[in-house]
Amino acid sequence: MKKALVAVMCSAMVLGAAGCGTSGNEVKTGEISNVEIAEKDVNLFVKDGTLTNTGATFILANNSDKDIQYDEPYRIEVKENGEWHKIDVEVAFIQPLYTLKPNETAVLEIGWENGYGKLPDGAYRLVKTVNYDDVENYESFDVAAEFTIG
């Protein structure tokens, strides 16, 4: 069933990875984010030495005792006056579904220039939604990696 679901999602929801984003080095700040980052055994962080204003390599680590699932979409938020704000941008993603086993990591090469443009100096976080792969106890939550440009 899971394989069929993945196949359907991959073939039916291919939207492309390009979006309508910002141009130049500006960030169009939106409303205050209501995302709550879960304190779970699943973590997201920037791999040392990979951060630029157009992308980075992120590590998604599953330190839990359960399989987790994740997909391509992410969002970037900017910190202003001590609060996280959404960045007004529309980005389309392909929709494959990945599974990460307990105590495994995944390397995520993320280039955001097509959607978010070149990020100016500031504090940001990349947010991804993941869920435990448990049909009886479905639980979806957000993980984030904070980073600073400049």
State where each predicted segment sits:
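Positively charged n-region of N-terminal signal peptides that target proteins for export
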Residues: 1-4, 8-9
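C-terminal motif of bacterial Sec signal peptides marking the signal peptidase cleavage site
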Residues: 16-19
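Primarily secretory-pathway and cell-envelope proteins
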Residues: 21-94, 99-101, 129-150
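Intrinsically disordered, low-complexity Pro/Gly/Ser/Thr-rich segments with frequent PxxP/GP/PP motifs
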Residues: 91-117
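A short tyrosine-centered beta-strand micro-motif
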Residues: 119-129
